[in-house]
């Protein structure tokens, strides 16, 4: 069993917004065998889903990665995407917190010396424009990513909350979800669009499991 809580306002308290635990039970009796940290598992799983999408939907030659956010989920996405695409030569990082952005770059610049890291501060346009893959790994409740920030042919991996304006989804050639039925009643951008009648079920091209 996996138990996860998401509190977006935790960011203002200087603590992570996603926490979780996992309980492993014996399959024949149901007795609990272990209680383990579910937070790391959740981060790995989330980034892995993004990588599955990237494997099939990313441009042919991925060289530039733009990541909006610099927390644990952003770091996990960089780690797995760089493993999936060794061709990545540049990683742009945009963060509301300069210290967090600097820590992100410091963590990876020695581990991946073949990658040029670009600190973009609050400039999400600089981070996203002309990037082959864009990842938003923040818990924003107001858009920071605009339609004009997205270059034709790029892949946008939406991880967080309501960090992109409606125009981003309307500009997309295809919208692919991990599981549309499970997620369409949440508060992410395309879910808001669905509730407002702007997006319909038939506008979703596919689920990742299709």
What role is predicted for each listed range?
Residues 69-71:
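Glycine-rich Rossmann-fold phosphate-binding loop(s) that bind the pyrophosphate
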Residues 1-43, 51, 58-61, 206:
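N-terminal ligand-binding/catalytic initiation module
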Residues 169-210:
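Adenosine-phosphate binding glycine-rich loop
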Residues 83-111:
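NAD(P)-binding Rossmann-fold cofactor-contacting core
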Residues 138-140, 160-161, 180:
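Short glycine-/small-residue-rich Rossmann-like dinucleotide-binding loops
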Residues 57-64, 87-88, 151-152:
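Short helix-loop-beta connector
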Residues 74-75:
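N-terminal Rossmann-fold NAD(P) dinucleotide-binding loop
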Residues 126, 133, 139-157, 167:
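Rossmann-fold NAD(P) dinucleotide-binding segment
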């Amino acid at each position: 069993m996996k138990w996860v809580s998401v509190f977006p306002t935790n960011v203002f308290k200087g603590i992570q917004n996603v926490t979780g635990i996992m309980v492993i039970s014996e399959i024949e009796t149901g007795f609990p065998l272990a209680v383990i940290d579910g937070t790391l598992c959740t981060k790995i799983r989330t980034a892995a889903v993004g990588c599955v999408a990237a494997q099939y939907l990313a441009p042919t030659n991925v060289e530039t990665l733009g990541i909006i956010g610099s927390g644990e989920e952003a770091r996990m996405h960089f780690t797995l995407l760089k493993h999936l695409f060794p061709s990545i030569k540049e990683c742009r990082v945009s963060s509301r917190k300069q210290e967090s952005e600097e820590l992100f770059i410091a963590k990876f610049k020695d581990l991946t010396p073949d990658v040029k890291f670009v600190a973009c501060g609050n400039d999400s346009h600089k981070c996203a424009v002309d990037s082959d893959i864009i990842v938003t790994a923040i818990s924003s409740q107001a858009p920071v990513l605009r339609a004009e920030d997205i270059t034709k042919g790029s892949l946008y991996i939406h991880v967080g909350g309501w960090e992109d304006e409606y125009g981003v989804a309307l500009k997309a050639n295809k919208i692919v979800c991990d599981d549309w039925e499970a997620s369409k009643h949440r508060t992410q951008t395309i879910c808001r669009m669905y509730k407002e009648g702007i997006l319909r079920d038939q506008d979703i091209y596919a689920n990742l499991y299709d």
